Every structure is written in structure tokens, then in C-alpha cells.
Amino acid sequence: LGGACVAGILGPLSDRLGRKKVLLSGVAFFVITCLLILLTHNIESFLVLRFLQGFGLSVIAAVGYAAIQETFEERDAIKVMALMANISLLAPLIGPVVGAFLIDHVSWHWGFIAIAFLAFLSWFGLKAKMPARTSSIPKKPLSYIWDDYMQVLKNKTFMGMTLGLPMVAMPLMLWIALSPVMLVEELGLSSMQYGLAQFPVLGGLILGNIVLIKVIDRLPLGKTVLIGLPLMLLGTAIVVVGIIWREYFLHCVILGMTLVSFGEGISFSVLYRFALMSSEVSKGTVAAAVSVLMMFTFFFVIELIRILYEHFHLWAYALSCFALIALWFTIPRGLLKTIMQQRKVNGEF
């Protein structure tokens, strides 16, 4: 939610000041908030600083992704995003195991110290290696920001493809949000067993991204999505089967979510590229619009399903995942097929 509040400003700001300056400022702000959270003594101040951390974190979605799409050629940009996804997955993959160890043996403070240190190192990496923008964008009055956003939001292809992104990403987000409750409280797994259960699920996403990198040059752009989404639908159906036969739920949910994460791995970066390139407006503004829509959707849908989970428990999770993927097969799938047909007519692979 914190990231969504400022992402809309960061994109247009990076169009005017340059991607590098805004990224460096965002990373520095994130490091500072990670260190300040060590001084908190109650849950209220802790949550305020977590909210502020979202400000710095949002520069990746609102500015960093736009910089990647502009710097690299089409398929290379998709490969870079897939590679970034694999690197960022180390946090939720290793985090539960390391976090359980820190809480049991040391203190939660060390987790934020480590995060601040790694972010501090990334600041120097960006400073040294990120290319500065050489082409200048004409500076328009600030009133044009609103006009640009209106142009983006009135683009039906953009809206359809962008709103399809949370449908694809949400089941895994729900897994990350609710798996501690499902596995530890509902099924009685230990903290270590819970951490180990994340490996096949998030490992599926890593494998999917690797497969995408390997095959993206051989298939028409978008083909991996048409392969990945049916796999995701199958995965969510397996989770529903696990709810019906409760004694097999643990095996079904891990198998099903592994298929879901693999399908997301071979699909999401391609869908993001199509969403970002569906508008002719400056990519900082478009990326910011994508980021804001996705973050608010994540926030509200996760909260809605959390409330449903309190009443319907595992059924709420399983049916929500299935419904989200099934929804993608409506308008977003039709738009994807249209884009692929248009690319074929234009002689684009």
C-alpha cells in the first residue's frame, strides 16, 4: 500500500529527472527506513515504517522496470526481468527458514540489518553500472501528468492486459500471505517444515523463469503464456481437489502451487512487456500506472480473501485461486490473442 501511494509520482518524475537519479534516491530512502525500524518499540511505529519502506521499494516497479524495457531489446528485456525475478525470489525462498532461525535464536532486528546492508550494496552497483539517460525528453508542465495518465487509462488494451497481471500473480501472492496460517496453524507444521514447504513452490517459479529464458527466442512472443496459463488453471484445480479430499491436502497444495508458480514463471514477464508497450505514453508514466493498479489490486484482493478466509478457511483460498486464473481466460486472453495476431500481420516474431 505504501508503494502504491507514491508509484504514480515516481514514474513521471523519472521521465523528467532521469531513471538513475530516482532509483538511487529510492534505494537510499529504503536503506534509511530499514535502519529506523530497528528503533521501534511498538507495533504502530513498526507498521508506519513498513508503510514508508514501500515508498522506496516502489521505485523498482515504477522506475526500474521501465528502465529495463527501454535499455534492452524486446526479448532481452523479458530475459532480464525473468532473471531479476529469480534473484528476488531468494528472499521468500530463504527468508522463512532464515527468519525462523533468527526469531528462535537471535532477534528479528538482524533481518532488517541484513536487508539494509544488501540494499546499501545495490546503491553502489546502480551508481557505478546503471547507464544514465542520453536522450532528453521535452519537459512538459506538471498538468500534463494528469493528461498522460488519462491517455493511459483510457487505452482498453492497456487496462485489459494490466488488470490481467494481478490475476496471474495473485495465487502465488496469496500463497505467500496465507501459507503461514494454512501450514502452521491449520496443518500444524513447524516453522522449519513451513520454510521447507516453500522450496518446491517457489522453486517452480525459478524453473519457469529459467525455461522462459531458454525458449523465448524460439517461440512467437506470447506462446509461453498460452502454455503457462492452462498449467496454472490445472494447478489451482489440484488445490481444490485437495480441499475435497482433505487427507491429501498438503500434497495437493504443494503440487498445485508448484504448477501455478511454474506457469507464472513462463508467463508473467511476457505479459508485463505487452502491458507496458500497449501505450505510446512515456514508459515511466506507463510503468507507474501498471505499478499503481497492481499494488492496489494486490492490497484489496488480499484483504478481501483474508476476510473470506476467516469465515471459510481453506475453501476460500482454493476457490479464490481457481477463480482468479479462470478470470484471465476471459478478456485478457482475448486481448493477448489479438496482440499476437497483429504481431504476425506486422511480421514480428
Regions inferred by a protein language model and the residue ranges of each:
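C-terminal membrane-cytosol helix-exit motif in multi-pass small-molecule transporters
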Residues: 117-135, 331-335
